[in-house]
């Protein structure tokens, strides 16, 4: 995103910190589901959730070596979770995480944009009603008057 054209709230959605937080949330949700299915020991997902965190700068350094964003992320999270990190990402592919997180980010962005469009449409309606009977005359190159577009 080009910073000067980006709204802060939308920029934050697409920053690495939010992306990695979504990845972590998805991995924890997968652990919770596997626990309910009896595929991992009971209580594991809660212990993982309590310990799980990441550091963006560390992930970037790891990715320089691994050339793989998800492996770099998982390596960093494993550092904080410890031995039970072996259950994180179990049965998942990188695409499972990447595609799902991308759709979540799109949804987050869409909600912000739709909220803005709703405000815009209300403003346009208010202006249109206010100027419904406002006369507006213009001459362009000495031709007959035409009605210009407002705004």
Residue locations for each model-derived region?
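A helix-coil-helix interface module used to build multimeric assemblies
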Residues: 1-139, 143, 147
